[in-house]
């Protein structure tokens, strides 16, 4: 993957904590130990696909960014592309947001959509959506790292 290659070139570390044979709390404890060792300002959950406990979310409040593969608030939770395909939507999108205790409901940092139509298969729709996810996540991370996001009353203000 080109992301892995760029990551190595930039000396960005990553870690893998398998979750099989661990309770959710045990898994999060291992992840928290790794996070705390690095003390990051921002934590990106890309393809994490696990619901976090409230304790974990509270511990890293304001630092967790998630990319969700739908144009929120539509199609919260798992399998949004399947849901979108079944509903016959005319646009699909992605949303980068801060993580809160409520699933996929945190303050929105960035969003984008692309048009789709009846000729798209479910697989084509998902592939097109993944491309949107990449660009939305990159934009959101850039905005956060450039300190251009202000959160107020559960909403974000993006400074240009």
Model segments located where?
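Single conserved hydrophobic/aromatic residue that forms the stacking wall/gate
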Residues: 1-8, 12
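Alpha-helix C-terminal capping/helix-to-coil transition sites in glycosyltransferase folds
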Residues: 7, 37-39, 59
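Adenosine-nucleotide cofactor-binding segment
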Residues: 13-40
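Donor/substrate-binding cores of folate-linked one-carbon enzymes
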Residues: 23, 27, 42-160
